[in-house]
Amino acid sequence: MDNLLVRGLTHKLYDKRKATAYELERVVKGYLENDETEKIRAVISQLANDFVYSPARGPNATFGGLIGLAAVAIALGPKIDSYMESILLPVLYCFNDSDSKIRYYACESMYNIGKVAKGEVFRYFNLIFDVLCKLFADTEITVKNGAELLDRLIKDIVMQQAATYMSSAEDIKNFKEGPVSSSIQDVPVMSTEQPRMHTFSLSELVPLLSERLYVINPNTRMFLVSWIRLLDSIPDLEFISYLPFLLDGLMNYLSDPNESIRIVTSNCLYDFLREIQKIAKVKYHILQRDEESEPDFFDSMVRRNMSDAELKEISDYVESSLRDGSFILEAHIQIDYKRILEIIIDHLGSSVPLIQEKALKWLFEFIYIAPKDVLLQIPKVLENLLPLMSNDENMRQSAKDLSQNLVILVSKIMDIEFSGSETNNKDNSLSVDFRSLIEVLQKLLSNDNEETRLCALEWVLLLQRRTGGKLINMHDPIFQTLLLQLSDPSDLVVSRTLELLAHIAISHKSVNLVPFLKSLLQMFAEDRKFLNSRGNLIIRQLCNYIEGERVYTSFAGILETEENLELASIMVEVLNNNLFTAPELYDLRKKLKQSAPKLQNIFTTLYTAWCHNSIAVFSLCLLSQNYEHAANLLSVFAEIEFNIDMLIQLDKLVQLIESPVFTYMRLQLLEPEKYPYLHKALYGILMLLPQSSAFRTLRDRLQCSSTPRTNTILANERLPRSRRDDPYWTDLLERLKAVQLSHQNNYREPIRATRLALAGALPSTPTATTISTTTSASGITTTASNSRDSFITRLPPTAALSTGARKKPKQ
């Protein structure tokens, strides 16, 4: 350039620089007409090196260089492709300048270059796009305005030419984009993208776009979302194939504090989902119309989520395209559903409600779009899904609906797997990782939220049922976790846990039932509060899920040989109370009342265990209408020491006699000639009771049924003794005596040990005898010395009373 042009371009006035640029444009056009390419390159080089890159020059020189480069580009017109690199790079360099005016003029220059170059900008698209990202975050309003203008131009070029433009330039084959790099590795070039040389390439843009998505600036975020929506709106680009690289960043935008960003991102994700659904529906329709291919269960899932109107719309679209010979783009697009699902599942565990809501929606739809991929991800899905049960009502309901749909899907695949039917022949690799699934559900059983624990139990129960009880046994870690769940504060959780444990216990020909009940008994032994708070509920629910007779006879077999006599007595008391009151045990009570020989084994089995609790045995005899044996038990009662617990049990028995369960027995009191031993047994209980409310209740009942005729029968007629010497009943009575003797010895052992310990501590030759005077609760004054005989006063009150009761009182 001559000195006149140089001075004009570096002038401080914009109008002077603009006029000089017009002159420069005229000069370059002359060079172009004369094919003087070297002079053109010299002008471009001078503008770049002497005006833009030179640090000695002031800002006016840079302004002149930028407007000069734009003038050269305009002069070159369609032939700019050979000079594109040398013109564009100096302009891009200016976008990093600290002077906002230079950045603005760079926008203006790039705009003019873009208007001329059009599709040629695709060769440097990543560089331009990266610059635009930074410009939208610029704090200077004029720069942002210039960036928006440039952005609109580039978008127009992309819309018009991105899918079709092919560059004719040959001088940049070895050009490498240095300033911009990406940390995203191994981005594949989709097979559906036609090879384009030096033109718009998604495989080069997407890594940069994916990386920039993690910026914080709201303006840049809006810019990025707008570009994503634009690229997706160009059908031939098949942009949807690259969604896995962008989805994570987009989902994060749903937590942006700026509402407008959340809205535009939500709409963008909605469009992506609709597009994926359409692709799946088109592929299903094409597969369905193919006579050689028959859609299987999974292929047909997409149809289940289509209305008749949608089905007709898709059918019309496919059929019309085939008639016209049009290319059906949706049929050829490949989408990585697995990677999309992984991202969605990760975001399901987000703490942001909008992200959770969007993830739920996508997962719900993917059950129909890609059921096989969902099945393979089931453990991770449930790990993040079930904790959502603790959220608000709407979120909880959405999570429940999704869980229910997953239940249907898993149930179907389990039916297929365990029946060995059609679908497995098509895809032998399809299988649910049950072990991983059980491990996840085991962790969820410890979740703080009740709904989550319940849902986890429902899932385990489903899996156990669908596998025919083969999935879980007593040796699996989850079994111990389930036992611990029995102490859950929620009755619903306990009930569901018992249903599952019952299913495990009765599977494999019930070989697990007795070990399970032993484990349960061990828990009761270790935690008495657990027995008191949950014992009745557990027993009743077990009898609801397993036949009551099996539960009780199995418990009886265990308790018969139980070495912990105190535990055995308490457990028999709990079992006995439920036997009389639980609706779940109605059938067992009915069987015990019958006198059929084949049902006698039930009574015998229970009796041998019930011997650990004498009052329970007596109750069992009344329930089974073995009144003679009940009357004979009174002789055993006379030999054992009654304590406060036994008196409380007698009080409860009287209450039971007044309850509906003993209606039949109360009516039998009206037939003393037929049931004489019933009167004797009840009168015996009356004599054992202290004069309390229970005593008066039973006395009144007996008086109501007592008539002169009854008294005559009981006084004068000899009671039948046909069964007294029967070996069967004799053995049962002896069994009771032996067990009760063991209990008495077990009760006295601590007292005896204390006596011996204290006796050993006394001096062998006492030096003095201390006499103490005490007053008993009855007001009787007694004296006791410090000799061994005085330890009788340290026995429990009931023991002392029973000892004295057997002594003949002085006259």
UniProtKB/Swiss-Prot annotation:
It is a peripheral membrane protein. GO terms for cellular component: cytoplasm; endosome membrane; fungal-type vacuole membrane; PAS complex. Residues 775-785 have a biased composition (Low complexity). Belongs to the VAC14 family. Keywords: Cytoplasm, Membrane, Repeat, Vacuole. GO terms for biological process: phosphatidylinositol biosynthetic process. Pfam families: Vac14_Fab1_bd (PF12755), Vac14_Fig4_bd (PF11916). Residues 775-811 are annotated as: Disordered. It is found in: Cytoplasm; Vacuole membrane. This is Protein VAC14 homolog. The PI(3,5)P2 regulatory complex regulates both the synthesis and turnover of phosphatidylinositol 3,5-bisphosphate (PtdIns(3,5)P2). Regulates the synthesis of PtdIns(3,5)P2 by positive activation of FAB1 and by controlling FIG4 localization. It comes from the Eukaryota. The lineage of its organism: Eukaryota, Fungi, Dikarya, Ascomycota, Taphrinomycotina. It comes from Schizosaccharomyces pombe (strain 972 / ATCC 24843). Component of the PI(3,5)P2 regulatory complex, composed of ATG18, FIG4, FAB1, VAC14 and VAC7. VAC14 nucleates the assembly of the complex and serves as a scaffold. Its main location: cytoplasm.
